Amino acid sequence: MVALRLIPCLDVAHGRVVKGVNFVNLRDSGDPVELACRYSDEGADELVFLDIRASVENRNTLVDLVSRTAKSVKIPFTVGGGIDSVSSINDLLRAGADKVSLNSSAVRNPDLISKSSREFGNQCIVIAIDAKRKVNKTDEWEVYVKGGRENTGIDVLSWAKKVEELGAGEILLTSMDGDGTQNGYDLHLTESVANIVNIPVIASGGAGCLEDIYDVFNEGRASAALLASLLHDKKLSLREIKTFLLERKLPIRPYE
């Protein structure tokens, strides 16, 4: 059985890790390299590094920061934010990233998914989907881009299926409604996407307690759980989370 993964997320703006609620009201959470090292040492299975201002400011992710961070950790590392070409992907992989995450650029140019998948292998290509529930709808979500600022009107489930067909190797699924709230993952959203694709789904947005993480694996059928606020705020440690999940017989890599 493939091990379920715990993945700390480092949202970076202007060279610092930040975290907000529902994609707004950002607060400083520390230095990205220091946090990356801390989480790696604490037993993280992977890391995700997202430059959340890059697509809004129409610039590429900072290669230097990626390089410094990647050199400091020994675990797989995904980087995203403002990546809009095969050459940009190549630069980031050469700088030390193991995977790249595409979001706004993939919506704008879906061919980028297939081109990059052919060039580098689909194991390197993660498609980030920022999903927001439609007003007065329980089973419908729309895709947002530009750091959650722009509604594309695209149905999340249709888009998830399409990116898989185009060659995505993984989906990073963020519930904008749950982001930073620590009120629990959107289990219905996560399960709905996991049920229609055959690639791993990383659940993001809302983790606030041990039960939330267990539920997103057990009920949401996620392959990985992205963690931010509750780790940055030191509400829980990765050791505590892994111990809890292992006691409940989930296939988690033990803390070493």
Swiss-Prot record:
Subunit structure: Heterodimer of HisH and HisF.
Active site annotation, chain numbering: D11, D130
Function: IGPS catalyzes the conversion of PRFAR and glutamine to IGP, AICAR and glutamate. The HisF subunit catalyzes the cyclization activity that produces IGP and AICAR from PRFAR using the ammonia provided by the HisH subunit.
A GO biological-process term: L-histidine biosynthetic process
NCBIfam families with a match to the protein in the record: hisF
Biological pathway: Amino-acid biosynthesis; L-histidine biosynthesis; L-histidine from 5-phospho-alpha-D-ribose 1-diphosphate: step 5/9
Catalytic activity: 5-[(5-phospho-1-deoxy-D-ribulos-1-ylimino)methylamino]-1-(5-phospho-beta-D-ribosyl)imidazole-4-carboxamide + L-glutamine = D-erythro-1-(imidazol-4-yl)glycerol 3-phosphate + 5-amino-1-(5-phospho-beta-D-ribosyl)imidazole-4-carboxamide + L-glutamate + H(+)
Species: Prochlorococcus marinus (strain MIT 9312)
Name of the molecule in the record: Imidazole glycerol phosphate synthase subunit HisF
Domain of life: Bacteria
Chief location: cytoplasm
Family assignment from sequence similarity: Belongs to the HisA/HisF family.
Its EC number(s): 4.3.2.10
UniProt keyword list: Amino-acid biosynthesis, Cytoplasm, Histidine biosynthesis, Lyase
GO function terms (MF aspect): imidazoleglycerol-phosphate synthase activity; lyase activity
Organism phylogeny: Bacteria, Bacillati, Cyanobacteriota, Cyanophyceae, Synechococcales
InterPro entries for the chain: Aldolase_TIM (IPR013785), His_biosynth (IPR006062), HisF (IPR004651), IGPS_HisA/HisF (IPR050064), RibuloseP-bd_barrel (IPR011060)
GO CC, alphabetical: cytoplasm
Catalytic class of the enzyme: lyase
Localisation: Cytoplasm
Classification via HAMAP family: HisF
